[in-house]
Amino acid sequence: MSNSSVPLLSAHSITKSFGPRTARHQVLFDVSADVHAGECLAVIGGSGSGKSTLTRIMLGLESADSGSVEYESQSIVGGRKSPGFAALRHESGLVFQDPFSSLDPRWRVAKSVAEPLRLQRRDLNNTDIDERVTAALTMAGLEPADFLNRYPIDLSGGQAQRVVIARAIINEPKVILADEPMSAIDVAARIQILATFAAIRAARPSTAIIMVSHDLGVVQHIADRILVLHDGRVEETGPTAEVLGNPQSDYTRQLIEAASL
């Protein structure tokens, strides 16, 4: 993990509400969070705690009602007009809960994984792209010769998620958002996905990962630091061993007890 004191990506005093003006539902209350280069930050909490909303705001996928978000010390607030937004979009990878909703059923694996390169790296020729697709699939734990020509319908849930991960890392992003990447697959596949993220961290030690998860068993094996959200507020945050070993809030203790850690 990087020793830099300056976060790669940071959010400050984020508030967010949904719904019509006459019936607004606030889901985030003055929430701040950051992640450093090379760090894995786990954002945990129960359903409806605001985990996904916070991380989507941090990656520029949603806008906040108030507060600020900075990528490499440049604001991304305001979308395309902001100085940091374009850089973040080009230097981030996304992995969501349902891999099949992220893959075009008409495309073979090779085309799906290559898509970010074809959109963002027009300087690369087909040979360069093929080599990078092969490398990304290999890092994701998939044998390229066995998977390049498959369609999503030919994949198990775990295999499809690893294809999505390969696509997320194809551009060597500086930050990856993994939003519940293991919740829709079986236990054996979860172990493989966990190993895939460990391999990414080993091969690319400066890459930051923000992982949204309700599975503390997964979190304790991969995260350097934990942020606990409850009803849209930060309950506590700190190094993983400290939060899980000596929780400071009743809510965190309840999560740990429920997970039987």
Describe the predicted segments one by one.
Residues 219-221:
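A short, surface-exposed alpha-helical micro-motif characterized by mixed small hydrophobic
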Residues 67-78:
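Conserved ABC transporter NBD signature motif
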Residues 59:
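Helix-to-loop junction immediately C-terminal to a conserved catalytic motif
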Residues 20-22, 76-93, 107, 111, ...:
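ABC ATPase NBD coupling module
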